[in-house]
């Protein structure tokens, strides 16, 4: 396939990062949960269920279920919107900040050393 070779390095980084996340026995996030996590942690907020639903092109009940799981994992929490009591805001948590730090390390390691993301996992496990 033309053009696939140009993408291979990025796919390798993605593969190695996800493999590293699985090996470190971190939270098991679906693609949608991971998307919500990254939006909330990498983009300035405030974030709302309505806004996330719009951004992901899914219904609000879908985002509500995603948030239920994120709260179970202590990766995010819903807090009342002080400006609109009918709405909630999505807030970050310390465990979520730690997970983001781990992901950044795994991505960096996978970028610098393709196929060696497991080295980052060993390093991260030493911090636990």
Please tell me what each predicted stretch does:
Residues 82-103:
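Basic, amphipathic "hinge/linker" alpha-helix immediately C-terminal to the N-terminal HTH DNA-binding motif
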Residues 46-88:
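Canonical helix-turn-helix DNA-binding module
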Residues 32, 60, 112-116:
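Surface-exposed, interaction-prone regions with an acidic/low-complexity signature
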Residues 1-28, 126-128:
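N-terminal leader segment of winged-helix/HTH proteins
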Residues 19-59:
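N-terminal helix-turn-helix DNA-binding core of bacterial DNA-binding proteins
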Residues 17, 21, 101-128:
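Amphipathic alpha-helical dimerization/coiled-coil segments
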Residues 16, 35-38, 65-71:
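Generic structural signal for well-ordered, non-membrane alpha-helices
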């Amino acid at each position: 396939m033309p053009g696939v070779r140009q993408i291979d390095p990025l796919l390798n980084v993605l593969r190695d990062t996800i493999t590293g996340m699985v090996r470190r026995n971190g939270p098991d996030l679906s693609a949608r949960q991971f998307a919500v996590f990254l939006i909330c942690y990498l983009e300035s907020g405030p974030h709302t269920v309505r806004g996330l639903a719009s951004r992901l092109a899914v219904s609000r009940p879908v985002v509500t279920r995603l948030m239920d799981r994120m709260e179970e994992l202590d990766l995010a929490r819903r807090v009342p919107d002080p400006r609109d009591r009918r709405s909630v805001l999505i807030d970050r948590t310390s465990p979520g900040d730690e997970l983001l730090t781990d992901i950044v390390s795994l991505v960096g390691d996978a970028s610098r050393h393709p196929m060696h993301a497991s080295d980052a996992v060993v390093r991260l496990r030493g911090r636990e």
